[in-house]
Amino acid sequence: MASMVMNVLCVAVACMVFSASYADAISCGQVTSGLVPCFGYLAAGGPVPPACCNGVRGLNNAAKTTPDRQTACGCLKGILAANTRINLNNANSLPGKCGISIGYKITPNIDCSKIH
């Protein structure tokens, strides 16, 4: 679990360094922070912690614009690439378990430029 968190944090830092910074724009740091309580569920399933759904709903509320949603998508791709232990079925069921719809399937090769 510690190595997964370290991988995610490295991806988040890389995304923050290489992405444009806007005052109101969502960042990979925000995406990572929102998903940290979800890592156990994403890897192993089981009950979704309330803190996880709070983070997921917070990210959904923060990603109001198309650029924000595309950035969040890119961050999710980076998290998937860095963490091979994440179960894609768990990742794709998470939004629904938290009562939201993100409008796309989470995959390692999603074209985030098509997210609107």
From Swiss-Prot:
InterPro entries: Bifun_inhib/LTP/seed_sf, Bifunc_inhib/LTP/seed_store, Plant_nsLTP. Residues 1-25 form the signal peptide. GO terms for molecular function: lipid binding. SMART domains: AAI. Disulfide bonds join C28-C75, C38-C52, C53-C98, C73-C112. One of its GO terms (biological process) is lipid transport. Plant non-specific lipid-transfer proteins transfer phospholipids as well as galactolipids across membranes. May play a role in wax or cutin deposition in the cell walls of expanding epidermal cells and certain secretory tissues. This is Non-specific lipid-transfer protein.
